[in-house]
UniProtKB/Swiss-Prot annotation:
InterPro entries: Mit_carrier, Mito_Metabolite_Transporter, Mitochondrial_sb/sol_carrier, Mt_carrier_dom_sf. The keyword Transmembrane applies. UCP are mitochondrial transporter proteins that create proton leaks across the inner mitochondrial membrane, thus uncoupling oxidative phosphorylation from ATP synthesis. As a result, energy is dissipated in the form of heat. Antiporter that exports dicarboxylate intermediates of the Krebs cycle in exchange for phosphate plus a proton across the inner membrane of mitochondria, a process driven by mitochondrial motive force with an overall impact on glycolysis, glutaminolysis and glutathione-dependent redox balance. Continuous export of oxaloacetate and related four-carbon dicarboxylates from mitochondrial matrix into the cytosol negatively regulates the oxidation of acetyl-CoA substrates via the Krebs cycle, lowering the ATP/ADP ratio and reactive oxygen species (ROS) production. Pfam families: Mito_carr. It comes from Danio rerio (Zebrafish). Solcar repeats lie at residues 11-107, 115-204, 213-298. It is found in: Mitochondrion inner membrane. Residues 1-10, 102-120, 199-215, 293-310 are mitochondrial intermembrane. This is Dicarboxylate carrier UCP2. Residues 277-299 are annotated as: Purine nucleotide binding. One of its GO terms (biological process) is adaptive thermogenesis. The gene is ucp2.
Protein backbone atom coordinates (compact mmCIF):
# COMPACT_ATOMS: atom_id res chain seq x y z
CA UNK A 1 0.00 0.00 0.00
CA UNK A 2 1.15 3.52 -0.70
CA UNK A 3 2.29 5.00 2.60
CA UNK A 4 0.78 8.02 4.31
CA UNK A 5 2.99 11.07 4.49
CA UNK A 6 4.86 11.59 7.75
CA UNK A 7 7.67 13.83 6.65
CA UNK A 8 8.00 11.48 3.66
CA UNK A 9 9.40 8.78 5.97
CA UNK A 10 7.76 5.40 5.20
CA UNK A 11 6.20 3.66 8.21
CA UNK A 12 8.16 0.79 9.72
CA UNK A 13 6.87 -2.79 9.86
CA UNK A 14 6.23 -2.37 13.60
CA UNK A 15 4.17 0.77 13.03
CA UNK A 16 2.10 -1.02 10.39
CA UNK A 17 1.64 -4.09 12.62
CA UNK A 18 0.45 -2.13 15.66
CA UNK A 19 -1.48 0.41 13.60
CA UNK A 20 -3.41 -2.24 11.68
CA UNK A 21 -4.56 -4.07 14.82
CA UNK A 22 -5.55 -0.84 16.56
CA UNK A 23 -7.40 0.52 13.52
CA UNK A 24 -9.27 -2.77 13.09
CA UNK A 25 -10.39 -2.69 16.74
CA UNK A 26 -11.68 0.87 16.31
CA UNK A 27 -13.53 -0.18 13.16
CA UNK A 28 -15.08 -3.13 15.02
CA UNK A 29 -16.34 -0.85 17.80
CA UNK A 30 -18.22 1.22 15.21
CA UNK A 31 -19.57 -1.59 13.03
CA UNK A 32 -20.07 -4.57 15.37
CA UNK A 33 -23.91 -4.35 15.41
CA UNK A 34 -23.94 -4.66 11.61
CA UNK A 35 -21.68 -7.70 11.84
CA UNK A 36 -23.97 -9.30 14.43
CA UNK A 37 -27.01 -8.65 12.21
CA UNK A 38 -25.14 -10.26 9.30
CA UNK A 39 -24.42 -13.39 11.36
CA UNK A 40 -28.05 -13.69 12.53
CA UNK A 41 -29.33 -13.41 8.95
CA UNK A 42 -26.77 -15.91 7.66
CA UNK A 43 -27.68 -18.61 10.20
CA UNK A 44 -31.45 -18.04 10.04
CA UNK A 45 -33.17 -21.32 9.23
CA UNK A 46 -30.55 -23.51 10.90
CA UNK A 47 -31.62 -26.19 13.38
CA UNK A 48 -30.52 -24.06 16.31
CA UNK A 49 -32.32 -20.96 15.17
CA UNK A 50 -32.75 -18.10 17.56
CA UNK A 51 -35.84 -18.39 19.72
CA UNK A 52 -38.00 -15.74 21.26
CA UNK A 53 -37.75 -16.93 24.90
CA UNK A 54 -39.74 -20.09 24.21
CA UNK A 55 -42.32 -18.49 21.92
CA UNK A 56 -40.92 -19.91 18.68
CA UNK A 57 -38.17 -18.88 16.29
CA UNK A 58 -37.35 -15.22 15.81
CA UNK A 59 -37.77 -14.02 12.23
CA UNK A 60 -35.21 -11.51 11.02
CA UNK A 61 -36.00 -9.30 8.05
CA UNK A 62 -33.33 -7.03 6.65
CA UNK A 63 -30.43 -5.34 8.36
CA UNK A 64 -32.22 -2.74 10.42
CA UNK A 65 -35.18 -5.06 11.03
CA UNK A 66 -32.75 -7.58 12.53
CA UNK A 67 -31.15 -4.92 14.72
CA UNK A 68 -34.59 -3.67 15.83
CA UNK A 69 -35.77 -7.20 16.65
CA UNK A 70 -32.63 -7.96 18.65
CA UNK A 71 -32.96 -4.76 20.68
CA UNK A 72 -36.65 -5.46 21.36
CA UNK A 73 -36.25 -9.15 22.27
CA UNK A 74 -32.77 -9.25 23.83
CA UNK A 75 -31.89 -5.66 24.69
CA UNK A 76 -29.31 -3.26 23.19
CA UNK A 77 -26.33 -5.13 24.67
CA UNK A 78 -27.08 -8.11 22.42
CA UNK A 79 -25.77 -6.12 19.45
CA UNK A 80 -22.30 -6.25 21.02
CA UNK A 81 -22.40 -9.89 22.14
CA UNK A 82 -18.98 -11.35 21.37
CA UNK A 83 -17.23 -7.96 21.23
CA UNK A 84 -14.41 -9.07 23.54
CA UNK A 85 -13.65 -12.05 21.31
CA UNK A 86 -14.03 -9.74 18.29
CA UNK A 87 -11.42 -7.31 19.63
CA UNK A 88 -9.09 -10.19 20.53
CA UNK A 89 -9.54 -11.43 16.98
CA UNK A 90 -8.76 -8.08 15.37
CA UNK A 91 -5.62 -7.43 17.44
CA UNK A 92 -4.18 -10.80 16.43
CA UNK A 93 -5.84 -11.11 13.03
CA UNK A 94 -5.68 -7.68 11.40
CA UNK A 95 -2.17 -7.05 12.71
CA UNK A 96 -0.99 -10.01 10.64
CA UNK A 97 -3.16 -9.85 7.51
CA UNK A 98 -3.02 -6.06 7.06
CA UNK A 99 0.05 -5.03 9.03
CA UNK A 100 2.36 -7.55 7.34
CA UNK A 101 0.91 -7.16 3.83
CA UNK A 102 3.47 -4.61 2.62
CA UNK A 103 6.38 -6.58 4.10
CA UNK A 104 5.26 -9.83 2.43
CA UNK A 105 4.62 -7.97 -0.83
CA UNK A 106 8.20 -6.64 -0.74
CA UNK A 107 9.42 -10.18 -0.07
CA UNK A 108 7.70 -11.44 -3.22
CA UNK A 109 9.00 -8.51 -5.29
CA UNK A 110 12.49 -8.88 -3.78
CA UNK A 111 12.39 -5.32 -2.44
CA UNK A 112 11.24 -3.66 -5.66
CA UNK A 113 8.87 -0.67 -5.40
CA UNK A 114 7.03 -1.81 -8.53
CA UNK A 115 4.64 -4.56 -7.43
CA UNK A 116 2.59 -6.34 -10.07
CA UNK A 117 -0.89 -7.76 -9.56
CA UNK A 118 0.56 -11.26 -9.07
CA UNK A 119 2.81 -10.32 -6.16
CA UNK A 120 -0.02 -8.34 -4.55
CA UNK A 121 -2.37 -11.32 -4.80
CA UNK A 122 0.25 -13.68 -3.39
CA UNK A 123 0.92 -11.31 -0.49
CA UNK A 124 -2.81 -11.04 0.24
CA UNK A 125 -3.26 -14.83 0.20
CA UNK A 126 -0.22 -15.37 2.40
CA UNK A 127 -1.07 -12.89 5.15
CA UNK A 128 -4.74 -13.90 5.06
CA UNK A 129 -3.86 -17.55 5.68
CA UNK A 130 -1.27 -16.65 8.33
CA UNK A 131 -3.83 -14.55 10.20
CA UNK A 132 -6.33 -17.43 10.36
CA UNK A 133 -3.65 -19.74 11.73
CA UNK A 134 -3.10 -17.27 14.57
CA UNK A 135 -6.63 -16.07 15.32
CA UNK A 136 -9.07 -18.90 14.47
CA UNK A 137 -10.22 -19.64 18.07
CA UNK A 138 -11.22 -16.00 18.59
CA UNK A 139 -13.24 -16.08 15.37
CA UNK A 140 -15.12 -19.21 16.48
CA UNK A 141 -16.01 -17.52 19.78
CA UNK A 142 -17.10 -14.30 18.10
CA UNK A 143 -19.48 -16.07 15.72
CA UNK A 144 -21.00 -18.23 18.46
CA UNK A 145 -21.59 -15.29 20.79
CA UNK A 146 -23.20 -13.31 17.98
CA UNK A 147 -25.42 -16.27 17.09
CA UNK A 148 -26.73 -17.02 20.57
CA UNK A 149 -29.86 -15.29 21.87
CA UNK A 150 -28.97 -13.20 24.92
CA UNK A 151 -32.41 -13.37 26.55
CA UNK A 152 -33.43 -16.29 28.74
CA UNK A 153 -31.44 -18.98 30.52
CA UNK A 154 -30.53 -21.14 27.52
CA UNK A 155 -27.31 -19.32 26.64
CA UNK A 156 -24.52 -21.58 25.40
CA UNK A 157 -21.78 -19.39 26.87
CA UNK A 158 -21.78 -16.81 29.68
CA UNK A 159 -18.37 -15.19 29.20
CA UNK A 160 -15.39 -15.28 26.88
CA UNK A 161 -13.31 -17.50 29.17
CA UNK A 162 -16.34 -19.74 29.80
CA UNK A 163 -16.70 -20.16 26.05
CA UNK A 164 -13.05 -21.16 25.61
CA UNK A 165 -13.36 -23.70 28.44
CA UNK A 166 -16.72 -25.08 27.31
CA UNK A 167 -15.69 -25.56 23.69
CA UNK A 168 -12.39 -27.20 24.67
CA UNK A 169 -14.21 -29.51 27.13
CA UNK A 170 -17.16 -30.49 24.93
CA UNK A 171 -15.55 -30.48 21.48
CA UNK A 172 -11.88 -30.84 22.24
CA UNK A 173 -9.02 -28.71 20.99
CA UNK A 174 -10.32 -29.15 17.43
CA UNK A 175 -13.52 -27.33 18.39
CA UNK A 176 -11.58 -24.08 18.78
CA UNK A 177 -10.24 -24.54 15.25
CA UNK A 178 -13.57 -25.50 13.69
CA UNK A 179 -14.01 -24.06 10.23
CA UNK A 180 -10.31 -23.34 9.72
CA UNK A 181 -10.48 -24.62 6.12
CA UNK A 182 -13.33 -22.37 4.94
CA UNK A 183 -11.93 -19.51 7.02
CA UNK A 184 -8.54 -19.76 5.32
CA UNK A 185 -10.32 -19.81 1.96
CA UNK A 186 -12.53 -16.88 2.94
CA UNK A 187 -9.69 -14.77 4.29
CA UNK A 188 -7.39 -15.49 1.39
CA UNK A 189 -10.20 -14.23 -0.87
CA UNK A 190 -11.09 -11.31 1.41
CA UNK A 191 -7.50 -10.26 1.91
CA UNK A 192 -6.67 -10.45 -1.79
CA UNK A 193 -9.77 -8.51 -2.79
CA UNK A 194 -9.75 -6.01 0.06
CA UNK A 195 -6.07 -5.09 0.21
CA UNK A 196 -5.27 -5.46 -3.48
CA UNK A 197 -8.37 -3.47 -4.53
CA UNK A 198 -7.55 -0.75 -2.00
CA UNK A 199 -3.95 -0.79 -3.20
CA UNK A 200 -4.90 -0.54 -6.89
CA UNK A 201 -7.61 2.11 -6.48
CA UNK A 202 -5.35 4.25 -4.33
CA UNK A 203 -2.42 3.88 -6.74
CA UNK A 204 -4.66 4.81 -9.69
CA UNK A 205 -6.07 7.90 -7.94
CA UNK A 206 -2.61 9.12 -6.96
CA UNK A 207 -0.91 8.40 -10.30
CA UNK A 208 -3.69 10.13 -12.25
CA UNK A 209 -3.51 13.11 -9.86
CA UNK A 210 -7.27 12.90 -9.29
CA UNK A 211 -6.64 12.98 -5.54
CA UNK A 212 -3.80 13.53 -3.12
CA UNK A 213 -2.74 11.01 -0.48
CA UNK A 214 -5.29 12.23 2.03
CA UNK A 215 -8.67 11.47 3.59
CA UNK A 216 -10.89 11.64 0.43
CA UNK A 217 -8.51 9.28 -1.38
CA UNK A 218 -8.49 6.82 1.52
CA UNK A 219 -12.29 6.99 1.86
CA UNK A 220 -12.88 6.34 -1.85
CA UNK A 221 -10.36 3.50 -2.01
CA UNK A 222 -11.75 1.85 1.13
CA UNK A 223 -15.37 2.06 -0.02
CA UNK A 224 -14.52 0.52 -3.39
CA UNK A 225 -12.54 -2.24 -1.70
CA UNK A 226 -15.45 -3.03 0.64
CA UNK A 227 -17.95 -3.34 -2.22
CA UNK A 228 -15.72 -5.62 -4.33
CA UNK A 229 -14.84 -7.77 -1.32
CA UNK A 230 -18.48 -8.32 -0.32
CA UNK A 231 -19.44 -9.55 -3.80
CA UNK A 232 -16.55 -12.00 -4.07
CA UNK A 233 -16.38 -13.27 -0.48
CA UNK A 234 -20.07 -13.55 0.46
CA UNK A 235 -20.59 -17.26 -0.48
CA UNK A 236 -17.55 -18.45 1.48
CA UNK A 237 -18.48 -16.17 4.39
CA UNK A 238 -21.97 -17.69 4.68
CA UNK A 239 -20.58 -21.25 4.65
CA UNK A 240 -17.93 -20.32 7.23
CA UNK A 241 -20.49 -18.74 9.57
CA UNK A 242 -22.97 -21.62 9.36
CA UNK A 243 -20.30 -24.28 9.78
CA UNK A 244 -18.58 -22.63 12.76
CA UNK A 245 -21.93 -22.10 14.52
CA UNK A 246 -23.30 -25.59 13.76
CA UNK A 247 -23.92 -28.22 16.43
CA UNK A 248 -21.38 -31.03 16.70
CA UNK A 249 -22.10 -33.59 13.97
CA UNK A 250 -24.55 -31.41 12.05
CA UNK A 251 -22.15 -31.18 9.11
CA UNK A 252 -19.28 -33.56 8.40
CA UNK A 253 -17.23 -30.81 6.76
CA UNK A 254 -17.43 -27.29 5.36
CA UNK A 255 -17.98 -28.81 1.91
CA UNK A 256 -20.89 -30.87 3.29
CA UNK A 257 -22.34 -27.65 4.74
CA UNK A 258 -22.06 -25.92 1.34
CA UNK A 259 -23.68 -28.87 -0.48
CA UNK A 260 -26.53 -29.00 2.06
CA UNK A 261 -27.16 -25.28 1.58
CA UNK A 262 -27.18 -25.65 -2.21
CA UNK A 263 -29.53 -28.65 -2.28
CA UNK A 264 -31.97 -27.34 0.35
CA UNK A 265 -32.11 -23.63 -0.44
CA UNK A 266 -30.44 -23.09 -3.80
CA UNK A 267 -27.68 -20.68 -4.90
CA UNK A 268 -29.37 -17.66 -3.29
CA UNK A 269 -28.54 -19.10 0.14
CA UNK A 270 -24.87 -18.27 -0.45
CA UNK A 271 -25.72 -14.57 -0.61
CA UNK A 272 -27.92 -14.55 2.48
CA UNK A 273 -27.21 -11.45 4.52
CA UNK A 274 -25.55 -9.72 1.55
CA UNK A 275 -26.81 -6.24 2.44
CA UNK A 276 -25.62 -6.32 6.06
CA UNK A 277 -22.37 -7.83 4.80
CA UNK A 278 -21.90 -4.88 2.46
CA UNK A 279 -23.01 -2.28 5.00
CA UNK A 280 -20.69 -3.79 7.56
CA UNK A 281 -17.71 -4.46 5.29
CA UNK A 282 -18.05 -1.15 3.45
CA UNK A 283 -18.26 0.89 6.65
CA UNK A 284 -15.62 -1.28 8.34
CA UNK A 285 -13.21 -0.72 5.47
CA UNK A 286 -13.76 3.02 5.50
CA UNK A 287 -13.23 3.34 9.27
CA UNK A 288 -10.31 0.90 9.35
CA UNK A 289 -8.32 2.21 6.37
CA UNK A 290 -8.86 5.89 7.21
CA UNK A 291 -7.87 5.24 10.84
CA UNK A 292 -4.94 3.06 9.77
CA UNK A 293 -3.54 5.73 7.47
CA UNK A 294 -3.95 8.39 10.16
CA UNK A 295 -2.34 6.18 12.80
CA UNK A 296 0.64 5.46 10.56
CA UNK A 297 1.12 9.20 10.03
CA UNK A 298 0.72 10.01 13.74
CA UNK A 299 3.00 7.19 14.92
CA UNK A 300 5.76 8.08 12.44
CA UNK A 301 5.49 11.78 13.36
CA UNK A 302 5.76 10.87 17.05
CA UNK A 303 8.72 8.62 16.30
CA UNK A 304 10.49 11.41 14.42
CA UNK A 305 9.84 13.89 17.23
CA UNK A 306 11.15 11.38 19.76
CA UNK A 307 14.44 11.01 17.87
CA UNK A 308 14.80 14.71 17.03
CA UNK A 309 17.10 16.51 19.51
CA UNK A 310 15.70 19.63 21.16
Amino acid sequence: MVGFRAGDVPPTATVKFIGAGTAACIADLFTFPLDTAKVRLQIQGENKASTNMGRGPVKYRGVFGTISTMVRVEGPRSLYSGLVAGLQRQMSFASVRIGLYDSVKQFYTKGSDHAGIGSRLMAGCTTGAMAVAVAQPTDVLKVRFQAQVSAGASKRYHSTMDAYRTIAKEEGFRGLWKGTGPNITRNAIVNCTELVTYDLIKDALLKSSLMTDDLPCHFTSAFGAGFCTTIIASPVDVVKTRYMNSAQGQYSSALNCAVAMLTKKGPKAFFKGFMPSFLRLGSWNVVMFVTYEQLKRAMMAARQNWHTPL
